[in-house]
Each structure stands twice: as structure tokens, then as C-alpha cells.
């Protein structure tokens, strides 16, 4: 892994500033070609890992493929799936499919999106309920499990409970 990772929030239109900014970003990067040029510039400096919501932004995978074709270099894909964490058999099947889709896209690392993981957090017991089930699904799909985290407790509880998490 490189020390620097390409983050795709801005590229995908998640400015966290305003709807107008988000629309401007999506308009600027409405094709895989414009996104590919960004990836190619990073690859020029051996920054070869990309983190994003590949199931949400349909330009990311084609842009990865274009950048790889144009540079002859491979990008490490770190996918942040949105998974259904409801405690039902149907939700688990839906989550499993979302995780398997990450593997099909070629992700090496799968980090369920923070908004999903945070729903499982129990501050009283200092646990992340059912997290081991999702981490096992990630391993079964052949990827390295990680967690997207905006809350410090996600990292703290995962480490404290020795969950099978390799990166944050």
C-alpha cells in the first residue's frame, strides 16, 4: 500500500459543503474519462490505491480501467460498500451480496461505509454488534476487511474486541 491513497469523495460529488458544490463536482466529473485523468496523474507518482463508493459512483470502475490501460499500472481498489445491517436473514443476504459485488469489482480491501458500521455500535457494552459476521463475509469473498470510520469508537471498540479488522 502506498502512504497516500486517492480518496473519491470529492470526485464522486460528496463535497460535504453544499448541494451546489456537489452538483458542480458531478458535472465536472460526469464521465469516466475526466476521472481517469485524475487517477493517471496519481499513478504517475506511484500513488496506486483508490478508496471510494464504487457501487454508488458508476464512473469509478470504468475510470480505474481506463487509467490502468493508459499507464500500464494497476490500482489497488478499496471499496466502501453500503450494506444493510438490519438483523434479519434477508438483510444479511443483501449485505453478503453487496460484499461479494465488491470482490467482483476487483477490490482488495472492503471497508463497509461508516454510516452502516455506526448503526451497530453499542457504547454501553463497547462492542460493534454483529460486526464479526460482516468481517467473515469479507474474508469469505477473498478480501481484506477494514472499517470506514468517522467515530473514534469504531476504531477503539474494534481494537479492544480484537475484531478481524486490518485497516481503518
Describe the residue ranges of each PLM region.
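N-terminal binding-site loop/beta-alpha segment at the start of enzyme catalytic domains
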Residues: 1-69
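Hydrophobic faces of well-ordered beta-strands that scaffold small-molecule active sites
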Residues: 2-8, 50-52, 75-80, 110-112, ...
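Short charge-dense sequence patches
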Residues: 9-13, 43-49, 79-90, 146-147
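An acidic- and aromatic-residue-enriched active-site/binding cleft used to recognize and process polar
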Residues: 55, 82, 150-152
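Glycine/proline-rich, positively charged
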Residues: 86-168
Amino acid at each position: 500500500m502506498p502512504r497516500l491513497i486517492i480518496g473519491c469523495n470529492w470526485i464522486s460529488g460528496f463535497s460535504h459543503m453544499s448541494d451546489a458544490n456537489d452538483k458542480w463536482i458531478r458535472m465536472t466529473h460526469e464521465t469516466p474519462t475526466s476521472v481517469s485523468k485524475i487517477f493517471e496523474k496519481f499513478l504517475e507518482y506511484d500513488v496506486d490505491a483508490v478508496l471510494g463508493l464504487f457501487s454508488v459512483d458508476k464512473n469509478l470502475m470504468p475510470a480505474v480501467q481506463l487509467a490502468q490501460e493508459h499507464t500500464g499500472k494497476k490500482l489497488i481498489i478499496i471499496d466502501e460498500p453500503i450494506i444493510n445491517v438490519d438483523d434479519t436473514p434477508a438483510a444479511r443476504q443483501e449485505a453478503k451480496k453487496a460484499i461479494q459485488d465488491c470482490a467482483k469489482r476487483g477490490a482488495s480491501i472492503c471497508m463497509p461505509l461508516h454510516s452502516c458500521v455506526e448503526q451497530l455500535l453499542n457504547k454501553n457494552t463497547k462492542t460493534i454488534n454483529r460486526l464479526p459476521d460482516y468481517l467473515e463475509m469479507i474474508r469469505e469473498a477473498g478480501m481484506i476487511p477494514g472499517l470506514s470510520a468517522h467515530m473514534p469508537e469504531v476504531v477503539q471498540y474494534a481494537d479492544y474486541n480484537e475484531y478481524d479488522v486490518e485497516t481503518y
